[in-house]
């Protein structure tokens, strides 16, 4: 996000979001779309069982949206600023570059963000290069962020991710992405860590290693139990007190490096500091600490064409199916069910530290935003 976009697009949108939150105007289009493009995954993570969806026949792979269906959905949505792609493993979709091209054609995002388990370096690099060429041709100002996951150093990473040899492929992927970033100025390489009971004891080692790689940014978020991940009841989440202490140490390192950042990068890192403090309080207090704008600023699209207010409420409180309304986003977005779910969120009947929603919440909450400025 650059300063011009924030001042001319993002911040003015927050005024409309606040009015919609209080029921004073119809809900405008969201600024963030997260699209789970597939539930196929080669990882066998201790923190996530999404890979079991097809082997255990929870759903059928043939139910996933086609490229043409995706184009129809995007065409009905209008502009989205942040386009987050997730999975499953996104790079296992052969048409991933075509999905990004459809997003460029219809959503016109400023940022495209894709995480990866880094198990298929050649596929990741070839598809990334195809996407970068699409951006070069159609949207040279759009940034592409690829975020390999790093949950431990060496053997621990393979143990947590459940695939022997993942560590070596991760290093290969990061190296090749870093080389690709030298050719394409709009490619950003980021590292992400899921903080769980399996790696909470070695976050300092992980962070020191990440910084030695020279990547542009690093972020972490807490492991959560979600129906989406089929991990309800799994002992994966650190206690609130543990997470708060971990994030306190992590924040100290971020603050120490703030002076080395460019002005806007300092604001971005400061937003993360606010998030870490907020997430620690949410996990500890088990409540919404600031108002949540899920289903207003952000929306989640499943591989099957269902809209969720967020991936945490997901199966429990879906907004509706786009396949049932001829792929017309507005019909679900402005439905009575969507209004009912937004009331539930506003009444603070749920709470979670979901990162991409939390950043939108911070931008819409003036006291929190001022902390980052």
Model-found features: residue ranges?
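Radical SAM enzyme [4Fe-4S]-AdoMet core and its adjacent flexible, acidic
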Residues: 1, 106, 137-294, 298, ...
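Conserved alpha-helical substructure of the radical SAM core
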Residues: 2-144, 226-227, 238, 373
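Flexible mid-to-C-terminal extensions adjoining Fe-S/redox cofactors in radical SAM and related proteins
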Residues: 10, 16-18, 24-29, 51, ...
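Residue-level signal for mature regions of secreted extracellular proteins and peptides
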Residues: 34, 38-41, 285, 303, ...
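Generic structural signal for small/hydrophobic residues in well-ordered secondary structure
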Residues: 37, 41-42, 66, 124, ...
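Short, flexible loop/turn elements at secondary-structure junctions
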Residues: 41, 89, 116-118, 150-152, ...
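General secretory precursor processing signal
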Residues: 44, 48, 152, 295, ...
